[in-house]
Amino acid sequence: MIDRREIDVLRSLLESNAETTSTDLIERFGGDTASLQSVIESLERDGYCFEQKAGTIRLLSEPDAVRPQSVGARLTTHTIGREVYVFRETRSTNDLARQAGVGKASEGVVFFAEQQTAGRGTHGRNWVSQGNQGLWFSILLRSTLPVERWPVLVQMAALAAAEAAETWIDDPIAIKPPNDLVLGGGKLAGFLLETCNAWNFQVLGIGMNVRSAPQIEGYPTSALDDFARKRVPLSELAAGILNRFEDWYLRKTVEWVAEAVANSKFPL
């Protein structure tokens, strides 16, 4: 579990245009110079780079990978992303979320993997999840929607992912019902909803090709970076999807979502 202070310090640096004083951080989050330095050193061990001089701290760069600190520092959510876990490798993030659901974890926990060895799509198909080449993650939900309306959760995820991705590109993204996003004629992202009625939870899996897309014969694919105006930061994109998903999930009615998909600016 990531030290919450790492997220708070990183958020403060991002909000202050990457630089602030050590005194300000200590006043905001408590502790002393030694405890603040411990937080900075922990972040540095995880790939963050800082410049410290004359009592100021400047964030120079973040890891080119999904990190819970970078995602958490950009979240504006109340439920989705309340806990964020990142695994270098796992069989399937949906399996991790399912285990958490059975263990009575709170709604909104998110599991990311840099690489999945047994990721899956709809109808049991294999989902190729190459190391650090995209976003592969699952959200634990405890929706009170009637069972017959659970598929709308996939529509919410598709809208959220399309909205987040479009901020980096000029080309149109299309929602291809029931489970895909299409960009440039190839599959950009897919969504998988798995449910467990006995334990009253749903697992929403999301996969998006970002750095590159797997080459699959007879099945066109696309990667976001190939269309982006600049290299897309994975953690920033992930936070954007989670922020938008919560907006759809907590604030929009099922009818509103259905209308949004039907009249979407992301038509196929």
Task: Name each model-derived stretch.
Residues 1-46, 145-173, 183-268:
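Long, positively charged amphipathic alpha-helical accessory segments at protein N-termini or as interdomain linkers
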Residues 2-166, 231:
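N-terminal lobe of the biotin/lipoate ligase/transferase fold
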Residues 51-53, 176, 194:
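Solvent-exposed beta-strand sheet faces enriched in polar/charged residues
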Residues 88, 175-177:
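Short loop/edge segments at beta-strand edges and connector loops
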Residues 111, 177, 202-204:
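Residue-level marker for buried hydrophobic side chains located in beta-strands
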